[in-house]
Amino acid sequence: MATKKEEVKFEDNLAELENIVRKLESGDVALEDAIAEFQKGMKISETLKKTLNEAEQTLVQIVGKDDNESEFSAEQKEY
């Protein structure tokens, strides 16, 4: 399960990525700076994607456990 520190880090990274996108969309960034910001944004994007994939896997495991427990409980009630 994610700790509070990990959640804040995810939110901070997401906010930073949104800030980069706004800068690039504004068009007020020099080419060299735009390239650097784009590269930074891509790295942040990969980090966010990894975090989301890990969270998804955790949820799949939890749901899988809950399904097994539910089936077990239903079987007990039939007896």
UniProtKB/Swiss-Prot annotation:
Top-rank EC class of the record's enzyme: hydrolase
Catalytic activity: Exonucleolytic cleavage in either 5'- to 3'- or 3'- to 5'-direction to yield nucleoside 5'-phosphates
Gene Ontology annotations of biological process type: DNA catabolic process
Alphabetical list of Gene3D superfamilies matching this protein: Exonuclease VII, small subunit (1.10.287.1040)
Source organism, top-level taxon: Bacteria
GO cellular component, one term: exodeoxyribonuclease VII complex
Transmembrane in keyword set: no
Function: Bidirectionally degrades single-stranded DNA into large acid-insoluble oligonucleotides, which are then degraded further into small acid-soluble oligonucleotides.
Family per similarity comment: Belongs to the XseB family.
Name the record gives this protein: Exodeoxyribonuclease 7 small subunit
Lineage: Bacteria, Bacillati, Bacillota, Bacilli, Lactobacillales
Gene: xseB
